[in-house]
From Swiss-Prot:
Motif (Meso-diaminopimelate recognition motif): 423-426
Originating gene: murE
Residues engaged in binding meso-2,6-diaminopimelate: R399, D423, N424, P425, R426, G474, E478
Residues the entry annotates as binding ATP: G126, T127, N128, G129, K130, T131, T132
Descriptive protein name: UDP-N-acetylmuramoyl-L-alanyl-D-glutamate--2,6-diaminopimelate ligase
């Protein structure tokens, strides 16, 4: 355990903002108290907590420092604006700093004894493919007895532990705590999905990465970043010296990936490509099959025939990224290729829903929720569907509106039947979201427009003809739907199973 004064003094930005900490301990008697935890939530401050009041997009959390202290916090670190607005009246220990982002990360890393300095971290960033790529890397590491934690969109997990995630990349206080717990559990590695939000908000400050992977960059999150250049700039932060301490693994087929490659020293980069033989890692002799892909990996350590259980070219790129990362981390490439055959897959990623051996239609659930990922999923499914390809999809509310007509156009062009439905409308009008999507669909194409997602899934599966394929896109692993401000239970896979049972009853 650490005393408050010692913890605060370990962060240079705090010392610079409050030099009196070193000389005037009587000004803040709490400096001698033991810190039992960190919290950015003023309502969750048990006795002994240090409250860190982070500014948000709508409100400055630091303005609630008094509530945090009343709840049990021994001190608060807040923004200068918050302290000016609500100055201490009774000698409370409240410290203002100009920029809370590095301070929060610094305090969290120090409190949890800098777990990232012991763990070997692998960071995976990109619009699409983060989850599958990170699962593959974690799988390859564990298969070769390199114990690894996984932190990402679905969960934080390691052998014997799993907890559902609330964010793709946790906030700094939670992230450092999870890394410390992973280290304490005996893990040597931690494979992390690193979102653009996390990079822009400094959540992964105090983390140095032995390997950083860039999968691709396509339109998403423009409600947050504003422009594609801002979005790219956020992703590119992972490849700065402050984060990248080892090798970058970059998709050469992506134009933004090529820009990253051009910025970095050649000996610090592994490039990969599905088709381009100038890359360090590429494939040849490909045979795309309904159950996966067969071919040959070409690597700096030789050629390896493979059979991957993951369908589609986009998944092949994810496998290449994982193989390249594993090779950099010292894994045996032949063993990785052998283990690939038994990779269990990722929940909600081109996940087949089948209730009987003689099922006469294919049903797949995928997380595709961007124009590029929807296109990839449809193209991956198309060759193996003898009948019609039916695509059920929607777009989330309170998110990037500009991608809605793009997704409508892609579904209409690549599927035989586009079924436009609700995703997570949140606080937007669901009918307006549907209208935005339909704007991208040519007038000579007639989509089904069914606002209720369960109804859309049941109707599509009920009316599918033998040989048809139904792709349910957008939610993947999610087991909820957000309507207004309410989160209700909803799972595309459960709905698909129910619809299939009714189809055959």
């Amino acid at each position: 355990m650490v005393k408050l004064g010692q913890l605060l003094a370990s962060v240079p930005e705090v010392v610079a903002a409050a030099p009196w900490l070193a000389q005037e301990s009587d000004r803040c008697p709490a400096l001698g108290k033991i810190v039992t935890g960190l919290s950015t939530n003023s309502h969750a401050c048990p006795p002994g907590t240090l409250f860190i009041g982070m500014p948000g997009t709508r409100v400055d959390g630091g303005e609630f420092w008094s509530g945090a202290l009343e709840a049990g916090a021994i001190a608060a670190v807040v923004s200068e604006k918050a302290l000016q607005k609500f100055p201490p009246q009774n000698g409370e220990c409240v410290i203002a700093v100009p920029d809370l982002v590095p301070v929060c990360a610094g305090l969290a890393a120090a409190f949890y004894q800098h777990p990232a300095q012991t763990l070997q971290l692998v960071g995976v960033t990109g619009t699409n493919g983060k989850t599958t790529t990170s699962h593959l890397i974690e799988y390859f590491l564990n298969q070769q007895q390199r114990s690894s934690a996984l932190l990402g969109t679905l969960y934080t997990r390691w052998p014997g532990y799993q907890k559902t995630a609330t964010h793709t990349t946790p906030f700094a206080t939670d992230l450092q705590k999870q890394l410390a717990e992973a280290l304490q559990a005996g893990n040597q590695y931690a494979v992390m999905e690193v979102s653009s939000h996390a990079l822009a908000q400094g959540r992964v400050l105090q983390c140095g990465f032995a390997c950083a992977v860039f999968t691709n960059l396509t339109q998403d999150h423009l409600d947050f970043h504003g422009t594609m250049e801002n979005y790219f700039a956020a992703k590119a932060l992972l490849f700065k010296e402050s984060y990248l301490q080892g090798r970058a693994v970059i998709n050469q087929d992506d134009p933004y990936g090529q820009r990253l490659i051009d910025r970095l020293p050649l000996d610090q980069v592994y490039t990969y490509s599905v088709n381009d033989s100038t890359a360090d890692f590429y494939t040849k002799d490909l045979d795309y099959q309904p159950t996966g892909v067969k071919g040959t990996f070409v690597t700096p350590q030789g050629e390896f025939p493979f059979l991957s259980p993951l369908v589609g070219q986009f998944n092949l790129a994810n496998v290449l990224a994982a193989i390249a990362s594993g090779l950099h981390l010292g894994l045996d490439p032949a063993a990785m290729v052998k283990d690939l055959l038994d990779f269990p897959g990722v929940p909600g990623r081109m996940e087949q829903v089948q209730i009987r051996p003689d099922q006469d239609i294919s049903v797949m659930v995928d997380y595709a929720h961007t124009p590029d990922s929807l296109e990839n999923a449809l193209k991956a499914a198309r060759p193996f569907i003898p009948g019609r390809l039916i695509c059920i999809f929607g777009c989330g509310g309170d998110r990037d509106r500009t991608k809605r007509p793009l997704m409508g156009n892609i579904a209409a062009q690549l599927a035989d039947l586009a079924v436009v439905t609700s995703d997570n409308p949140r606080t937007e009008d669901p009918e307006q979201i549907l209208a935005d999507v339909v704007q991208g669909i040519s007038l000579d194409i007639e989509p089904w427009i069914i606002g209720d997602r369960a109804t859309a899934i049941h109707k599509a599966i009920r009316e599918a003809k033998p040989g048809d394929g139904v792709l349910i896109a957008g939610k993947g692993h999610e087991d909820y739907q957000i309507l207004g401000t309410e989160k209700i239970h909803f799972d595309d896979r459960e709905q698909a199973r129910e619809a299939l049972i009714l189809r055959y009853s």
